[in-house]
Amino acid sequence: MGCVHSTGSEAKKRSQLIDAQLRLEHDQCGTEVKLLLLGAGESGKSTIVRQMRILHVIGFSKQEKLAYRAVIYSNMIQSMLVIIRVMKALGIDFENSAHKEDAHQFSSHYLHIHNADLSEAFSLELSDLMKNLWSDAGVRRCFKRSREFQLNDSTEYYFNSLDRISETTYLPTQDDILRARVKSTGIVETDFMYKDIYFRMFDVGGQRSERKKWIHCFEGVTAVIFCVALSEYDMKLAEDKIMNRMHESMQLFDSIVNNRWFTETSMILFLNKMDIFEEKIRHIPLNICFPEYKGGTSVTETSNYIRSVFEKLNKRKSTAQKEVYSHFTCATDTNNIRFVFDAVTDIIIRYNLKDCGLF
């Protein structure tokens, strides 16, 4: 099973029982689909995997939720530390001078904290410090410039829920878990049944250092789902401060869609983080990434342009050898992913399983 955060004997036993049931159903069905999730770092691949667990497995156990609680605490602490550091670098002052001391206390106490130290609820002191800081207009001004530095997409969501998350009995909701940021390392497999098909989904780390592992997953792939973060058209890579993230995704997609390993493989493009893109495109023009773009500023026109740019990278389209099936997605929206994955499954059945006697 693709459970990254399971801990304890109960969770292990539970996972083994699910795996056994899936194998039994697979033996009865006889149809197996291998899905490979690829894309640059922070494109939303791991969130898609969590949605598959919610939609097609059994969600998350209490132990897993507790593990995610520590991740969420860490995300929030790291986000605030980043904002404090960047405020100094950008010369942004706290509107309330008392909050400068709050920032000093926060940084000195929690700069070196690790996930292992976050099994308990936020202390009252820490919660109050974060509330004070998040309420400061200077902090908000810095946050609004987050495209200039590396900050989790979930920062605003979590801090706007700080009262709830600070409760001693806090247990992450489904939405909280979907927004948790965990860097993918290695290869994580998630198995599930859907429409009488046994799916094996592989999530592979998207950072440059992780991509050398991709080749080990290429054999026998039924379909590739390539994730692109639409919202990153104006941002730089964490690993390369010069490289535009969208351009990096384009280069990566070019190398995948035209790869000899995938000549007979369905290629599905998820243009993800549509919700963030819709907000950002109102303020930041698309030609910051594509200088040649002369179209309008509407969400529809700009997103369709990005889709066309990626689809044109498919060099086999002109010979009718390979079609790229594109979908606009919001990986944190369960209803959206339910609808999109249903369409994806139909594509896979129609174009990749004809020889398996399904229809």
Swiss-Prot record:
GO MF term list = G protein-coupled receptor binding; G-protein beta/gamma-subunit complex binding; GTP binding; GTPase activity; metal ion binding
Query: What are the UniProt keywords, alphabetically?
Result: GTP-binding, Lipoprotein, Magnesium, Metal-binding, Myristate, Nucleotide-binding, Palmitate, Transducer
Q: Where is this region: G2 motif?
A: 176-184
Lipid positions (N-myristoyl glycine):
G2
Q: Note whether rRNA processing occurs among the keywords.
A: no
Q: Name one GO cellular component term.
A: heterotrimeric G-protein complex
Q: Where is this region: G3 motif?
A: 199-208
Q: Which residues are involved in binding Mg(2+)?
A: S46
Describe the location of the G-alpha domain by residue ranges. Answer: 31-359
Which one GO biological process term can you cite for this protein?
Answer: adenylate cyclase-modulating G protein-coupled receptor signaling pathway
Q: Which Pfam families match?
A: G-alpha
Q: Region annotation G1 motif: residue ranges? A: 34-47
Query: Does the UniProt entry include the keyword Transport?
Result: no
Q: Where is the lipid attached (S-palmitoyl cysteine)?
A: C3
Q: Which domain of life is it from?
A: Eukaryota
Residues that coordinate or bind GTP? 39-46, 178-184, 203-207, 272-275, 331
Q: Where is this region: G5 motif?
A: 329-334
**Annotated region G4 motif: where?**
268-275
Give the PANTHER family listed for this entry.
GTP-BINDING PROTEIN ALPHA SUBUNIT, GUANINE NUCLEOTIDE-BINDING PROTEIN ALPHA-4 SUBUNIT
Per its database record, what is this protein's job? Guanine nucleotide-binding proteins (G proteins) are involved as modulators or transducers in various transmembrane signaling systems.
Family indicated by similarity: Belongs to the G-alpha family. G(i/o/t/z) subfamily.
Binding partners and assembly: G proteins are composed of 3 units; alpha, beta and gamma. The alpha chain contains the guanine nucleotide binding site.
Q: What is this protein called?
A: Guanine nucleotide-binding protein alpha-4 subunit
Q: Report the gene name.
A: gpa-4
